[in-house]
Structures are given as C-alpha cells and as structure tokens.
Amino acid sequence: MNQEIIRQTPLWAENWPIAYAVVQAVVILLVVVLVAALMSFIERRLLAWWQDRYGPNRVGPGGMFQIVADMLKIMFKEDWTPKFADKLTFRLAPAVAMATAVLSFMVIPVSPALGVADMSIGLLFFMAMAGIAVYAVLFGGWSSNNKYSLLGGLRSAAQTISYEVFLGISLMGVVAIAGSFNLREIVEAQRDVWFIIPQFLGFLIFVVAGVAVTHRHPFDQPEAEQELAEGYHVEYGGMKWGMFFVAEYVNVVLISALIVTLFFGGWLAPFNLEIPFVPPVFWFVIKTAFFVMMFVLARGSLMRPRYDQVMNFGWKICLPLALVNLLVTGAVILMNQA
C-alpha cells in the first residue's frame, strides 16, 4: 500500500509535504461544499423526473443556473436574529453544523494518495464529529425561544443519539474483520472481497442509522413541515439557514462516501478490474453518486412514520440486529483463528 501511495504522489509533494497537505485539504473540502450545494438542484431535477414533473427549468439551459439564483437569493436576504433569541448560541448553531459536517471529510480516503488526514482512529473521529453535530440542532432549537424549534431540537437530539448507538455498533463488524479503525486499511482489506458480503446485515443497519442521523426523509421528524413548521431552524433565514441547508447535503455525501469506503471497496474497482487510464478516484465518485441518488429516491418514494415509531424501530429492531451482527462476526473470526 505504501508503495502505491508513493507512486501516485506528485514529485513536488516530497519536497513540500505541508503545502501538499494544505492543497489536498482545500481541494477536497471545496469540492465537497460545491457538490453539496449542487445537490439541491440535482435532487429537485431527479424528484421531478421520477414524479413526471418539469422541475426547475427556467434559469439557464435546462435550469442549470437555478442553484446560482438560489445562492444569490439567500446571500442577499436580511441576516436577521430574533429579539427574543439567545444571540450568541443562535449564531453559533449553524457554524457548528457546517464545521462538523465538513471536518468529518478529513478522514475519508478518496484514492490511495488523495485524502486530507490518514488517521489511525479515522472511524472514531467520524463518530466524535457526529456526536458534536447534535449540539448544532440543540443550540438552534433552544436559542430560538420558539416552541416548535425546541420540540424539533429535542426530537433531533433523542433521534441522533439513539441511532448513533446503532451506527457505531454496525461499524464494529467491519473493524473486527479489517483489524483497524483506519479507513485506508479498511479499504485495502477489501481487495479480495467487499465487506458488503460478510457484513450485509451491518450494511443495512448502517444505512438506516445513517439516514436517521442526517435527518433525511423518512427520518426527518426533527424538521417535519406538517408538524413542526421546519422544526429547529424555523427562526433562521438568509445565510444562517443556508449553512444548515448545505450542512445537511454535506452529511448526505459523507454518509454515502462512508458506505462506499466501509462496504463497497472505496476506490477499488469491481472484481479487481484493471482498466487503463481510469484513476481510482473515478470508482469512488461513481459509487458515492449512486448512494446519493438512493437518498434522493428515498425522499420521493417513502412516507414519514410517526416519531414514536422511529424510536421503537431503533431500539427494538436495529439495536438487537446490530448486536447479533457483532456477535456472529466475532464468533466467525474466533472460529477461523482456532
């Protein structure tokens, strides 16, 4: 693996390692934010296509510049803070949401040589950022001094903390097989077989928990329009609301990238194919784009369950299945070692 990384690293990076690391970080994080912003347009077009509607098609050819119009509209809206809100916490909440979402991408290896940070505890860093992200919605819900915001914040905290338990346990099977929390080593451990095969149950639990943690449909109870009038960010507008909005799409891309990294071989080609002139990052992007589309498809095809049903499903179904998956994985590993 080290030889492959050295072979794909530019020559100037050996003389300027700090500059190379900074360039990687800026490029990857900038691309992530731009893709998250672009997802707004992509989601609307896909939903319109699947529902036999036109979708945004007025601004630019095929509506391509709709995202630019939306960004300009948000940027020029009044940066308003309610008089009855706790101003410091109110302003801090969207920054925390955006920062935790973007920083989580530090540990995602896009290719053998492309990644911001090669941490030995990459998965633990992701879980830590996911835990801190809960404070964003709590701050937003409480500081707004609005009953709907507070209910949305409480819902979000309970739902996120609950499903992060199942999210973490579902990852332990992958960690046990790979023998590492390092995401690069987890990808390299899948050269013979992708972990979707031995960890199919863990994959299903991770997908469900990932959707719940990102508050995407059908687990969008914290911001249910029909029940809570947008929930914890009902008092937000302008760029503050835009930061919450972009952070949600960044989290969608993040969970999709983690699914690819943990269960579908990351940058590895299917069946160990070696196609000339096709870089490893191509496979990573294609796989991630597929799961991003699945997030959008879930929004257009599934109904929203009640909040109590979501919590019951997590604790009564996801938790036992996650524990069974971990127990069986540990037993199989011990049998193979014996």
Swiss-Prot record:
Q: Which domain of life is it from?
A: Bacteria
Q: Which InterPro entries match?
A: NADH_UbQ_OxRdtase_su1/FPO, NADH_UbQ_OxRdtase_su1_CS
Q: What class of enzyme is it?
A: translocase
Q: Which GO terms describe its biological process?
A: aerobic respiration
**Which chemical reaction does it catalyze?**
a quinone + NADH + 5 H(+)(in) = a quinol + NAD(+) + 4 H(+)(out)
Location of this chain's protein in the cell: Cell inner membrane
Select a single GO molecular function from the record's annotations and give it.
quinone binding
Q: Does the keyword 4Fe-4S apply?
A: no
Spans traversing the lipid bilayer:
22-42, 96-116, 121-141, 161-181, 193-213, 249-269, 277-297, 315-335
Ordered alphabetically, the record's keywords are:
Cell inner membrane, Cell membrane, Membrane, NAD, Quinone, Translocase, Transmembrane, Transmembrane helix, Ubiquinone
Is ATP-binding one of the keywords UniProt gives this record?
no
Q: Name one GO cellular component term.
A: plasma membrane
Question: What's the EC number here?
Answer: 7.1.1.-
Q: Name one Pfam family in it.
A: NADHdh
Q: How does it sit in the membrane?
A: Multi-pass membrane protein
Fetch the PANTHER family from UniProt: NADH DEHYDROGENASE SUBUNIT 1, NADH-UBIQUINONE OXIDOREDUCTASE CHAIN 1
Q: What does this protein do?
A: NDH-1 shuttles electrons from NADH, via FMN and iron-sulfur (Fe-S) centers, to quinones in the respiratory chain. The immediate electron acceptor for the enzyme in this species is believed to be ubiquinone. Couples the redox reaction to proton translocation (for every two electrons transferred, four hydrogen ions are translocated across the cytoplasmic membrane), and thus conserves the redox energy in a proton gradient. This subunit may bind ubiquinone.
Quaternary organization: NDH-1 is composed of 14 different subunits. Subunits NuoA, H, J, K, L, M, N constitute the membrane sector of the complex.
Q: State the similarity comment.
A: Belongs to the complex I subunit 1 family.
What name has this protein been given in UniProt? NADH-quinone oxidoreductase subunit H
Species of the source: Acinetobacter baumannii (strain ATCC 17978 / DSM 105126 / CIP 53.77 / LMG 1025 / NCDC KC755 / 5377)
Q: Which gene encodes it?
A: nuoH
